[in-house]
Amino acid sequence: MYLKSLKIYNFRKFGTNNNKIEFVDAKSFQEQRNKKEVNIAPTTTLIVGKNNCGKTTIIKSLDNLINNNKDAFKANDFNFLYLKKLIEYYEQAIPKLDDELKEKIKTPYLQFNICIGIENNSNDLVTNIVRFMKLDDINNSELKIVIKVELENEEVFIRDVKKLLEKNDNSSLRFNSFLELINDSDFKINYYNTDNDKIDNFNIKNLIELRPIKANNIESEKCLSKAFSKIIEYRYKTLFEEESDNLNSTIININRTLTKLISEKHTVSINKSLEEIESNEKLQVLLRADLTFQNVMNNLIKYEYVERNMNIPENQFGLGYTNLMMIIADLIDYMEKYPENSFNSKVNLISIEEPETFMHPQMQELFIKNINEAIASLLKSKNKNVNSQLIITTHSSHILNSKIHSGNTFNNINYVTTKNNYTHVVNLHDDIIIPKSEKKAHKREQDLKFLKKHIKYKVSELFFSDAIIFVEGVTEETLLKYYIDDNNKLNKYYISVFNIDGAHGMVYHNLIEILQVPALIITDLDIERDDDEKKNFKQISDLTGKFTTNKTIKKYNDDSNSLEELQHEQLKINNMYIAYQGKIEEYYATSFEEAFILTNYKNELLNSVLKKMKPQIYENIMGEGDDFTKIKENSYKLQKKLSNDKSDFANELLYKFITEDITIPSLPKYIKSGLSWLAKKLEGEE
């Protein structure tokens, strides 16, 4: 058996929509089971998202339910928006309670829907769960369990709510009193099937085990010694009883030898001295050795690592390495102690929350690979068949990369964010990110392969960004970061800028829409020119009969590459804003550099950079005078001459932005409009 999904209703930030967390699909689980080599990566569930979005809530809900901890659910665990709507309902319903109202009064509850996958020809014990199963469930090889945290006495609760409403007129005081009432009320955990039939004498703990592993568990300089001492102690006491008896016999003999030696060397001499003070019948000391198995485990085991044949003590370990080893120590402890029959008859979950603590990026990138190899080694050495699912919560882009590349898939990744004050879960899957297509099967495979590889190079930050900007060149990538930092509306948000050319950037569009992160895509008109126009550096002032080579514009322009009827300067598609050049100072720019030159052709700083970068060309254009309209009229020529020096051009501009007290050039209008849209989107105005 394995955990397929969990739906959370009204618990903390969770509401009633976009509340499903997917763990393992049948295909991934079966593929892992059929492989000879252990590889937990494809079935590892990753829960990613920024801080305070609901990642920990998912693990907490499982922990409370599995441990049947009904007392752990307090008023603060209910979604406050849900409770506010509930009290508004009471204000309307309770006055009608005695006469008009016929239906049952609603009471606060939490709900958790668990879906368990069952393997075909499985040896899993199903006697305890058959009451939850329906014919459809059997056909789908799954069962669904509905768990509700409900009031023990609804009548008393409704009576107390009525008193509360009569007593408090102030809405704020009412709500606080309502929270106190919920805290003072007793709740129970009930189980139902999907027909809402109550199932008695059932406990989810008999079906699911959860082992939470704390990632940030470094309490002292000797935490590793303590952790591994516990493991060795358990192994001796449980797995190697005969050796344990031999060790205890050795300890007893050591105590006898030491006690005899101490007695001969010290005890007799000390007692003779004491006889001078008091009779030895009244005052005498006994010195003896007291070495125990526990003392050996706690104090005599030293944890060291070897570096170039030198033993390095534990307190010189880096925190990241110590953190990783503590996690592995917990895994060893878990697998050593857990009985084989429990692994095969239950859903076994291991959760690790935010393991990236103290780890440097490279260690994070290899985290799942390291954990996978540790588990594989443990299973091989113990000859155990451990049917466990790993659940990791993280806000590290490196751990995300680790999951994608170790498992070679986007499957089983849950992106958690907040939307309208509710937790919003997005379930990722290869088939959603790059939809299947019979006609374009090969291209789909290539796109998916590209995305898995390319996302490693910083683009994984889009999962943790407030907004993202895609650009197609080094100039706009370099300069935009400066302009964003200088923008008081945007600089308070985490905005990532990615430089990906348009054709490859399109591979990300499905993912961007799925994640619903506001995305500004800055692209170029890429006006198609004939050979004469290129040779003579012809300026374009009219788009009649003109076409674009830009695949992004073509895709969202009804698959047409004609520029004649193209919407002016932008295309809006859901959470994406595609910005491109409109007419600037009488001309249409074909690139960002040309648009920047056209917008700022009179700007002193820009002219000084152009003159420095291309002195001969600049002099030929300007001649003896200072008529800057000549710069405007030769914008295409200038951008073509700069095409091999874009990085130098961008850095020279940036250097002058920072060091010179002079008017900074403006961004082109199409980019300004895009940034304005982004600001409104982030502030909830769009």
Swiss-Prot record:
| Positions annotated to bind a divalent metal cation 1 | 472, 559
Q: Which segments carry the region annotation ATPase domain?
A: 1-423
By its UniProt entry, which Pfam families does this protein fall under? AAA_15 (PF13175), OLD-like_TOPRIM (PF20469)
Needed cofactors: Mg(2+)
Q: Which parts of the sequence are marked as the site Interaction with GajB?
A: 131, 134
Query: Which UniProt keywords are present, listed alphabetically?
Result: Antiviral defense, Endonuclease, Host-virus interaction, Hydrolase, Magnesium, Metal-binding, Nuclease
Q: Does the keyword Magnesium apply?
A: yes
* One annotated GO molecular function: endonuclease activity
Name of the protein in question: Endonuclease GajA
Which residues does the annotation say bind a divalent metal cation 2?
476, 604
Task: Check the record and name the Gene3D superfamilies matching this protein.
Answer: P-loop containing nucleotide triphosphate hydrolases (3.40.50.300)
